[in-house]
Amino acid sequence: MVDTHKLADDVLHLLDNRIEDNYRVCVILVGSPGSGKSTIAEELCQIINEKYHTFLSEHPNVIEVNDRLKPMVNLVDSLKTLQPNEVAEMIENQGLFKDHVEDVNFQPIKYSALTSNNEECTAVVARGGTANAIRIATVDNPVNVNKLAQDSINIAQIVPMDGFHLSRRCLDLFKDPQTAHKRRGSPSTFDSNNFLQLCKILAKTSLCKVSSHHKFYSTSSVFEKLSKTFSQTIPDIFVPGFNHALKDPTPDQYCISKFTRIVILEGLYLLYDQENWKKIYKTLADTGALLVYKIDIDYEATEERVAKRHLQSGLVTTIAEGREKFRSNDLLNGRDIDNHLIKVDNIVHIRND
């Protein structure tokens, strides 16, 4: 079993070491289907946030949100802007770019939009269209810390790769839609274009620094330091999740807020050495604030886990069908991950048998 408390300590240690140079740190957590990566990511996130909530309960009124950000950065200034007529055409096509659904070289583009909460934002879309959109909220009204419930302030946030599954409608437009649906979960059935763009956005926010008029000492805790260095000018970033009942992405399910100082990215292909995936590691590693974990587990253990999950999700009607689906798709993806793991020295291997 994985010691998630030890992982939490390692992540907080990295944040403590990098807090003068990085606004946030990132964690990559990779494993084959059924390896437990989602559960580990959720536990890790919960442990860190609970630790911070305990600190806040013992140190009321410690939080400060200021605008002393260096550098002031436009997160998507280099992206092409869609014109209103182009946005209208995209919407008419059910939020898709019909000619680019399989184009892994398609460059993400931006346009003005609204979040699901009706807030003004910049939407970033790629070959998966609006189903896999990233939405960056407009920074306007200052945060009133006094009106925030302390237990609502979370410094860690998970970002599952699952939200970047290409929608079923998108897969319908593939040259071979039958194979695309059968092999859903393979590398080509994710919007790797926009996930890489998300990593570029996160890297930019990571490299921002917030100056503080407080002098920190060697005895200052990491929670004390980050509580004094929240920035008003870091925008909230909304990313999609995945609805297993609907079998499609869910817009704006996760929010990487200005209070998020630790982003836990989990998924199958975040260390994959092919197409857009191969650029993710370097994009985040170049910030100097990254931890990378690969979960190792025997395929015999994952087969039963995944077969039961397929049954519970309604993808199959019997456990035997679940095992067959695992062997014809999930097992192939797991072996593909192991055969195409990027070659870097700082991947920490952990077992979850």
Swiss-Prot record:
Keyword Kinase: yes
Annotated keywords: ATP-binding, Kinase, Nucleotide-binding, Transferase
Record field: transmembrane: none
GO MF terms, alphabetically ordered: ATP binding; kinase activity
Binding site for ATP: 31-39
EC number: 2.7.1.-
InterPro entries named in the record: P-loop_NTPase
PANTHER family for the chain: URIDINE KINASE (PTHR10285)
Function: ATP-dependent kinase that could be involved in endoplasmic reticulum membrane assembly.
Family: Belongs to the YFH7 family.
Name listed for the protein in its UniProt record: ATP-dependent kinase YFH7
